[in-house]
Each structure stands twice: as structure tokens, then as C-alpha cells.
Amino acid sequence: MADNKAKKEQVHDVFQNISGKYDRLNNIISFEQHKTWRKRVMKEMNVKSGSKALDVCCGTADWTISLSKAVGHTGEVIGVDFSENMLEVGKRKTKDMHNIQLVHGDAMNLPFEDNEFDYVTIGFGLRNVPDYLATLKELNRVLKPGGMIVCLETSQPTTPVFKQCYKLYFKFVMPIFGKIFAKSKDEYEWLQQSTFNFPDKEKLKRLFNQAGFSNVKVRSFTGGVAAMHLGYK
């Protein structure tokens, strides 16, 4: 429990500090590929108009905005994040989108009823929580029976060429970005640690199954540097 609390505090501090630069940093680090990955995931989801969606670890609300457009004016999207500063950025971006509500909350203890949402998403956020399985079980709790869970996250490359490029990127390129964007060494180191320590796509699929999700589909992007996990309750 002490380790979980320490990780929570560390991650909270990191995102509080980088919130103003997060969108730009995300674009640069992924070479804007995160936008392409999210579009492909949204196409795969085929979100129904009028539905209710929850975007967990919504950050500055990029995926929340995509979901808002998909559910339409008769639908509802709630974004939840535990960084107040990230939410403030998200609120500025979504101020004219009336089907979006952004709330402060913990992914491991969501402030929602059981079986409340048709869709639950978590994008580039699962790697930041202290307990992956406990978080997935909490997402399962708030999802309606038959509802869809989707995770878009960094992953471990599977092809030899991408594996080597991945290692070189983190060894030589990431330190440059860290010096430019991070206010402290802790922030830069967290970006590396959270990516390298995150389970590969097969291990993550097993966690989805353990959390109670079924028919879990996995799709890799850009040589395996990112992956989608899509399942049902």
C-alpha cells in the first residue's frame, strides 16, 4: 500500500508539472502518431450515437473530445483524471462542448455507480496507475453488462527492427525531449520508467481476462510501439 501511495503521489506531481506542455510533448514524442492510433481505435469502436461514455485518465481530454463527437448531442461523455492541472487544460479545450463533463477522480476508486456506462476508455493512462489489475476491475464495475472497454497504450515492439529503433529512441532521443520539456529529472525519468515497466500486449490481455472482460481483441500499431485492447463485460 505504501508503494501504491508513493507511485500515486509521484505520478500526480509529474502531470501537475507538465500539464501546460503535455499536448505539445505528446505530439513530439509520438511524432503525432497518437492521433492516428486514436482515429483507428475510434473506427474500431463504432460508437453509437446517444450512448454514455467514460474516459478514464482523460488528461487534457483529447479522447474525450473524440467520444463527444461520436455520441452526439443526445449522448454524454464524462472524463475523469486525478491531475487538477491536466483537467484545467481539458476544460479550456471543451468549454463549448455541452455533452462533456470533466471531473476530478481516482481511476482505482471511480465516483460512479455500478453498470453506468456503455463505453469505458483509458488512453495512455493505465501505465500510470499503481495497480493495473485493480484498475481494470474498477473499470469493469462501472461498465454496463455488454458494454465495451477500450485501452490504447504504449507497448513493447514485437518486430526486431522496431525493437532496436525503440531502444535507440529512448536512449538518445528521449533525453533531449526530457531536458527541453521536463522541469525536473523525475518527470523525464517517469516517462521512461512507465513505458518500459508496462506489460506487453499478451500479458495485458491476460489482465483484461482476469478483470472479467471477454472477447478481448488486441491490435498493434506502428510495429508494436502502441496497442489497443478492446473487450466486453
Swiss-Prot record:
Q: Per its record, how is this protein called by name?
A: Demethylmenaquinone methyltransferase
Keywords, sorted A to Z? Menaquinone biosynthesis, Methyltransferase, S-adenosyl-L-methionine, Transferase
Q: Which InterPro entries match?
A: SAM-dependent_MTases_sf (IPR029063), UbiE/COQ5_MeTrFase (IPR004033), UbiE/COQ5_MeTrFase_CS (IPR023576)
This chain's function reads: Methyltransferase required for the conversion of demethylmenaquinol (DMKH2) to menaquinol (MKH2).
Q: Which organism is it from?
A: Staphylococcus saprophyticus subsp. saprophyticus (strain ATCC 15305 / DSM 20229 / NCIMB 8711 / NCTC 7292 / S-41)
Query: Which Pfam family is an annotated match for this chain, by its short name?
Result: Ubie_methyltran
Q: Which gene encodes it?
A: menG
Keyword Endoplasmic reticulum assigned to the entry: answer is no
Report the catalytic activity.
a 2-demethylmenaquinol + S-adenosyl-L-methionine = a menaquinol + S-adenosyl-L-homocysteine + H(+)
| Annotated binding of S-adenosyl-L-methionine, by residue | T60, D81, D106, A107
Return the EC number: 2.1.1.163
Pathway recorded for this protein: Quinol/quinone metabolism; menaquinone biosynthesis; menaquinol from 1,4-dihydroxy-2-naphthoate: step 2/2
Q: Name one GO molecular function term.
A: demethylmenaquinone methyltransferase activity
